[in-house]
């Protein structure tokens, strides 16, 4: 009976979103506010005008019907302060963006394109067992991973819907371009074929079509960027997130760390390290990335 109780909700979730969702005229909005909400996208959802908005204090996104009454956003809101911080120099080739919080630990898991079957289910099940629900986790996801791993995606989405996880759906671009052996300055989002704006918006549309609300958090593939790429991301209303604790690279978390592991089975070493730290009591609690503070 236990196995059946798991299988039926997953099947129901898949069937629920078998219905057609049509997204049209999906365009960035000039940054204006309606009350405490900043409007970052306008679009047509199944024939109805909608807006993707972000609460300028909580940093949570939501979809709502279009409102005509707008005004300039509060310059001193959390959202705009974080945008300004993320958009400011210097612009390193690697690991630009916000890399550290003031307190707690922030778990981010990257879902880059992968030919490997399944996903790091052991990681998500471990935090679901360990912490009070819903457990905050950020998934920096790509469209190519979603398309190749639909069942894994639905499992993650279900855990979010039933309250086991509190998923922040982060943007890792749709395509995640990568050319083995090529210099970083001409790789990932700096590849000649990259259209970063389109790559970002395509991923957002893919999430919306699957019943998921995109967040305002973005991670550069390979953590590689330049000044132009950073400006592109922030002008779309997104906040780049780096890391100071890429576990598979030997970095260890400390108070305020943004932890990076891969949930796509491409880097099992990082997952093994995280699970060991969890067992040793060195991951006492997790915080949502929306709790990050500006300097």
What is each PLM-predicted segment?
Residues 129-231, 235-259:
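Metal-dependent polysaccharide deacetylase catalytic core of the NodB/CE4 family, i.e.
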Residues 1-108, 115-138, 144-151, 255-295:
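Terminal accessory/targeting
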Residues 112, 174, 223, 264-265:
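Catalytic metal-binding/acid-base residues of hydrolase active sites
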């Amino acid at each position: 009976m236990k196995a059946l109780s798991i299988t039926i909700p997953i099947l129901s979730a898949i069937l629920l979103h078998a219905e057609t969702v049509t997204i049209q005229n999906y365009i960035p909005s000039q940054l204006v506010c309606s009350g405490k909400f900043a409007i970052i996208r306008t679009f047509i959802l199944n024939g109805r005008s909608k807006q993707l908005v972000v609460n300028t204090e909580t940093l949570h996104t939501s979809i709502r019907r279009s409102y005509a009454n707008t005004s300039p956003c509060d310059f001193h809101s959390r959202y705009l302060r974080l945008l300004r911080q993320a958009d400011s120099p210097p612009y390193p080739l690697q690991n630009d963006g916000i890399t550290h919080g003031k307190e707690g630990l922030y778990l981010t898991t990257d879902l880059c394109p992968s030919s490997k079957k399944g996903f790091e289910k052991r990681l998500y099940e471990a935090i679901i067992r360990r912490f009070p629900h819903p457990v905050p986790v950020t998934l920096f996801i790509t469209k190519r991973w979603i398309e190749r791993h639909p069942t894994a995606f639905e499992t993650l989405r279900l855990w979010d819907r039933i309250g086991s996880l509190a998923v922040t759906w982060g943007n890792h671009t749709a395509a995640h371009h990568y050319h083995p052996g090529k210099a970083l300055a001409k790789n990932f989002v700096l590849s000649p074929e990259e259209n970063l704006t389109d790559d970002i918006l395509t991923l957002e549309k893919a999430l919306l079509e699957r019943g998921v609300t995109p967040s305002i958090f973005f991670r550069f593939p390979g953590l590689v960027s330049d000044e132009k790429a950073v400006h592109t991301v922030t002008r779309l209303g997104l906040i780049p997130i780096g890391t100071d604790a890429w576990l598979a690279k030997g970095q260890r978390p400390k108070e305020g760390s943004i932890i990076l592991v891969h949930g796509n089975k491409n880097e099992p070493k990082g997952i093994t390290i995280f699970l060991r730290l969890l067992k040793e009591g060195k991951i006492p609690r997790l915080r949502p990335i929306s709790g990050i503070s500006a300097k």
